[in-house]
């Protein structure tokens, strides 16, 4: 049975991809975890989750998403997230986990400053939910599936092809975010407070929480 190993701050210790190409595509199912769920954790990578079958009760920070087959969720870097069965039904999914630098390249790049960092640091954007309710969701979904296929086939130049498709996916998302979206920067205090709350909830998951 699978289990997510974390450190004291709930940071996942698993390496996603390699130093040369920090991207990993993996197939999972909730029933494959010891508790029938993947519990609260975070990592510096962005994670895209595509539900293949069943359903997942997906939580990101304070947000809850009721995901079904075909739904996609892009979780921001460094956000706390967890996934649970809903109505005791299993959920099968594929995850694309990658470091943001695949999109922007060098640290001093204008791509990082202009198109990536503002998203990563926006506390009001813990995740973007793709439920096919808008026309651009179909385009986004096609990019996700293309990345999965490229990774699985690993043909010549696949790293370049994945990087290019990932950049197109990122552009598709950015240009369709609401124009009036509030911008709230992350702070260490906010992140630590959130992790303390989630840590308490996780350790008391099987117990009745006393309200005082």
List each model region and its residues.
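Detector for the N-terminal beta1/A-loop initiation region of ABC nucleotide-binding domains
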Residues: 57, 82, 204
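Aromatic/histidine-rich interaction motifs
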Residues: 113-141
């Amino acid at each position: 049975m699978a289990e997510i190993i974390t450190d004291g701050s709930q940071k996942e210790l698993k390496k996603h991809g390699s130093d040369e190409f920090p991207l990993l595509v993996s197939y999972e199912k909730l029933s494959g975890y010891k508790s029938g769920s993947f519990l609260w954790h975070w990592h510096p990578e962005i994670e895209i989750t595509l539900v293949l079958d069943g359903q997942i009760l997906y939580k990101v920070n304070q947000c809850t998403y009721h995901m079904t087959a075909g739904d996609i969720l892009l979780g921001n870097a460094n956000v706390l997230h967890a996934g649970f069965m809903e109505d005791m039904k299993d959920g099968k999914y594929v995850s694309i986990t990658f470091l943001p630098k695949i999109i922007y390249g060098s640290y001093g790049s204008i791509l990082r400053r202009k198109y990536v960092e503002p998203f990563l640091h926006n506390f009001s954007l813990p995740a973007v939910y793709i439920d096919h309710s808008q026309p651009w969701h179909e385009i986004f979904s096609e990019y996700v599936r293309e990345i999965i296929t490229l990774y699985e086939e690993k043909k010549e130049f696949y790293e370049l092809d994945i990087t290019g498709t990932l950049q197109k996916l990122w552009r598709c998302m950015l240009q369709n975010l609401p124009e009036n979206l509030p911008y709230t920067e992350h702070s260490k205090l906010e992140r630590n407070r959130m992790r303390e709350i989630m840590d308490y909830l996780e350790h008391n998951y099987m117990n009745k929480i006393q309200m005082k």
